[in-house]
Amino acid sequence: VKKPKKEPLRQGKRRQHFLPLAIGRSGGVVLAALALWFFKQQADEVVDGHADRYDEAIMEAVHRIDNAPMHNVMHAATQLGSHVAIGTAAGLTAIMMLRQNRKHDAWTVVVSTGGAMAINTILKHVFQRQRPKELARRIKLPKSHSFPSGHSLLSAATYPIVLHHLVERRSMPVQAVAHTMAGLVILSVGFSRVYFGVHFPSDVLGGFAAGFGWLGITALSHTAAEATDRADLAE
């Protein structure tokens, strides 16, 4: 009986990795552990009410910034963290990976984004924190709960993995620029949520932590899947 053919490993230039997803098993464990530990600390602060001390001070300072150019920049930034933008970026990347016969990469993008959306929904339901309604400005207040920030969580879990797959075969300088841009986008998305007053700063920090935690878990599973493929082909 013939054994089914395994999906061939990607041929060509050896990939030179810069950051996430190529961090290996130990790196994935460390990233996930640190991020999830920080999320727990942040969640405890929110539940105990201790986060209010810095939430109010930061929001007061941020809300002093109020001008048309800044508003336009923040509006663009906050759109990058929406479900539509995140889903589109992940979907197009997955399709591109499939067309290149990079099934593991495509699956990783889908799982990372879909899992992040599910985690966001679950966490909001668990904590049920009310949004800072009296501080919202120039934007429609979402009906969902406040903690954690979904825009921040989805951005942290999706953009690094999307950028990684798009530039992983490029030179190290190109990868460095791409991941730096991803980092700036993630930070801008989080800041925009505080700027518009639809989230407390602690919501954004919690979203970042949960997102990076899930990113670490995704990176770990991706590395394990590729290692299994290599072992099967070596038999």
Question: What residues fall within each predicted segment?
Answer:
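Hydrophobic, membrane-inserted alpha-helices
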Residues: P69-N72, T88-A94, P160, I186-G190
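Hydrophobic alpha-helical transmembrane segments
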Residues: T78-N101
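Alpha-helical transmembrane spans of integral membrane proteins, capturing the lipid-embedded, hydrophobic core
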Residues: V29-A33, V109, T113-M117, F208, ...
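Membrane-embedded catalytic cores of phosphoryl/pyrophosphoryl-handling enzymes
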Residues: E134-E235
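Interfacial segments of alpha-helical transmembrane regions
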Residues: G24-S26, I95-A118
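N-terminal transmembrane-helix/juxtamembrane module of multi-pass inner/ER membrane proteins
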Residues: V1-A85, H125-P142
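Small-polar-interrupted transmembrane alpha-helices in polytopic inner-membrane proteins
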Residues: V110-R129, A178-S192
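Short hydrophobic alpha-helical membrane-entry/anchor segments
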Residues: L36-D48, M97-K103, T121-F127, F191-H199, ...
